[in-house]
UniProtKB/Swiss-Prot annotation:
Gene Ontology BP, a term: regulation of DNA replication
Keywords, alphabetical: ATP-binding, Cytoplasm, DNA replication, DNA-binding, Lipid-binding, Nucleotide-binding
Cross-referenced HAMAP family: DnaA_bact
Recorded name of the encoding gene: dnaA
Domain writeup: Domain I is involved in oligomerization and binding regulators, domain II is flexibile and of varying length in different bacteria, domain III forms the AAA+ region, while domain IV binds dsDNA.
Gene Ontology MF, one: ATP binding
Cited function: Plays an essential role in the initiation and regulation of chromosomal replication. ATP-DnaA binds to the origin of replication (oriC) to initiate formation of the DNA replication initiation complex once per cell cycle. Binds the DnaA box (a 9 base pair repeat at the origin) and separates the double-stranded (ds)DNA. Forms a right-handed helical filament on oriC DNA; dsDNA binds to the exterior of the filament while single-stranded (ss)DNA is stabiized in the filament's interior.
Binding site for ATP: G165, G167, K168, T169
Stated name of the protein: Chromosomal replication initiator protein DnaA
Main location (coarse class): cytoplasm
Annotated region (Domain II), positions in chain: 79-120
Region of interest: Domain IV, binds dsDNA: 339-458
Length: 458
């Protein structure tokens, strides 16, 4: 038996699955045949679990059928694990011409791309070590860490999308810093979209546009923040499109971020949006309670403060935000209040320090407001939230509203059930679990949920 069997299995799966599913879950797998065992290696635990639950049975059937065509009645064992094929050597680092020393000079439009000094623009303090991990962002973290280990090999391009303030920029810097830590000679550049556009305009004025394109195409990794800024800028999109193609063809890593899913970015050429979808698109969700607590404690420690657990939970339960910078602002206010008064950090001090912030937040997250916003979003009547109607067009929005009420308010399950037509707390619990399941399996539901949280947090 040989790896040709696995390649044929992949070819069949590629024909049966959507391009996105195949590229996301199966293409990254590495394989190794040893006697009667096919070992499959996934880049991270999340991918491994997804493949095991969704595709493993199909893979086993196809591999066995292919083996039987060559050797009837011969059985094959398939193992799935996290890691790399032991015999696969690490890709050698790209050789950087000696004429290209790393400097802190910005783009100047020199005549030859390989002689253009570059500035990474990376902020060294942003690393994986100080990025607080939780359920809302663990897939994004695992994926970017895998990319840092093998840039250009898997998940290329990577598209991260999230509401502002949820860590997209931090992760871009973290993966760039990790790549440079592994190979200091790598040419890695982080750049905001508006700076890219401005540099391109300057190169046109200076008649150095070809050198500009060559320079970006010569990088080992390009990290572009806020890609939605390119909307409506046709010439910039054309240059980005050419750069994109050149880098992907050369297996050079591209990571992009935006505040919305690629297909939702208006004013972007369809060719570019298609390219964005070639790799993996990952959302970063608003942090859940436990992650908010961890963020608060971490940010307090960075300021030399000891934030008691009960105080951290008190703040986290009342600031169910979609922007981590709000939590950072809360810690700054608490720190200033504690220093000014000389008091210890207690719930009483926090209530005083965050009085205005907590008042605004409480106003935004009432059950009535949630019902109103969800009803408007799904174009149903507010009265449907408490009615006995069970049609999907009504029941699904009602379940989503219940889940939002549990996440965004301090009401108990019985209180939430009462607000939704006197329903039992078990009905609310079922709704929350159902919505959580749907968000994992249905991109439309996931996007709706994120939009609703964003709206309710404004």
């Amino acid at each position: 038996m040989s790896l040709a069997i696995w390649q044929e299995c992949l070819a069949q799966l590629k024909d049966e699955l959507s391009a996105g599913d195949f590229s996301t879950w199966l293409r990254p797998l590495q394989a190794d045949f040893n006697h009667s065992t096919l070992s499959l290696y996934s880049p991270n635990k999340y991918t491994s679990e997804w493949v095991r639950n969704k595709y493993m049975a199909t893979i086993e059937d196809k591999v066995q059928q292919l083996v039987n065509q060559e050797n009837p009645n011969h059985s094959v064992k398939i193992r799935l694990m996290v890691g790399n094929v032991s015999s696969v050597e690490k890709k050698p680092a790209k050789q950087i011409p000696t004429q290209a020393p790393l400097t802190n000079q910005p783009w100047e439009g020199e005549s030859k791309a390989h002689r253009v000094p570059h500035k990474s623009n990376l902020i060294k303090k942003y690393t994986f070590d100080n990025f607080v991990e939780g359920k809302s962002n663990n897939f994004a973290i695992a994926t970017t860490q895998q990319i840092a280990e093998n840039p250009g090999d898997v998940y290329n391009p990577l598209f991260l999308y999230a509401h502002p303030g949820l860590g997209k920029t931090h992760l871009l810097h973290a993966v760039g810093n990790a790549i440079l830590a592994e190979n200091p000679e790598s040419k890695v550049v982080y750049i905001r979209s508006e700076r890219f556009v401005q540099d391109m305009i300057n190169s046109i004025r200076n008649n150095t546009i070809e050198q500009f394109k060559e320079y970006y195409a010569s990088l080992d990794a390009l990290l572009i923040d806020d890609i939605h800024f390119f909307a409506g800028k046709d010439r910039s999109q054309e240059v980005l499109f050419q750069t994109f193609n050149s880098m992907l063809d050369a297996h050079q890593q591209v990571i992009l971020t935006s505040d919305r899913f690629p297909k939702e970015i208006e004013g972007i050429d369809e060719r570019l949006r298609t390219r964005f979808g070639w790799g993996l698109s990952i959302p970063i969700d608003p942090p859940e309670l436990e992650t908010r607590v961890a963020i608060l404690i971490t940010k307090a420690e960075e300021r030399g403060l000891k934030l008691p657990d009960d105080v951290a939970f008190f703040i986290a339960k009342r600031l169910t935000i979609t922007d981590v910078r709000v939590l950072e602002g809360a810690i700054a206010n608490i720190s200033a209040k504690a220093q000014f008064t000389g008091q210890g950090i207690t719930i009483s001090l926090v209530q005083d320090a965050l009085r205005d912030m907590l008042a605004v937040h409480t106003k935004q997250t009432t059950i009535d407001n949630i019902q109103k916003i969800v009803a408007q979003h799904y174009r149903i009547k507010i009265s449907d939230m408490s009615s006995k109607r069970r049609t999907r067009t009504v029941a699904r929005p009602r379940q989503i509203a219940m889940a939002l009420a549990k996440e965004l308010t301090q009401h108990s399950l019985p209180e939430i059930g009462e607000a939704f037509g006197g329903r039992d707390h078990t009905t609310v619990l079922h709704a929350c679990r159902k919505v959580q399941e749907l968000r994992r399996e249905n991109n439309d539901i996931q996007e709706d949920y994120k939009i609703l949280i964003r709206t309710l947090s404004m």
